[in-house]
Amino acid sequence: WLHGMPKHYVSRPPKASDGCVVLANQDLLALKKFVDIGSTQVVISERLDFVPIDVWQSHRKAALRMVDTWKKDLEKGFSKGIYHYASDVKIDGQGLIEWQKNQQISNKSFGKISIDDLTVMRYPSDKDMMLVSFKQEDKLSGEIRKQQYWMKVGTRWQIVQEDTSKL
């Protein structure tokens, strides 16, 4: 999370943010003018490597094709969509089998899946990892926001973590 500090704090002890990025309230208010709260991605890295536009476009196109294939397979049924998930995937904090059992979706259909507000980010420190974030709507889940972490395993990209929140 990116957030400000309680009003009565002048500063915060180092490393007391529980993994969050903490800004002075004045700085957070200034930043608010330039970002869309709740949807602007924040990348933290020791170093950023910029790539030529054609390389970026090629990576983005490949990622969009991957997500589209995942979506189309999931529309055909969970047994088709499961192909895109790593065997040790965590979905909303659960392993695949546990999640599938709790959701009772193995024989249910998602129907038509709509995806909007899609963003794709390669991890700065790991070229074989990317974060895909989007809004999803289908008859089984309703309207949700999804974050998928895709990792390249050998020659194949797989979802290694998926987090969902209601909109």
What do the PLM-derived regions correspond to, one by one?
Residues V153, Q161-L167:
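Low-complexity, intrinsically disordered terminal/linker segments enriched in charged
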Residues K76-D92:
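Short, well-ordered alpha-helical segments enriched in acidic and aromatic residues
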Residues D27-L31, M66, W70, I82, ...:
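Stable alpha-helical elements in mature extracytoplasmic
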Residues G4-P6, D27, V35, E46-L48, ...:
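A mature extracytoplasmic/lumenal domain signature
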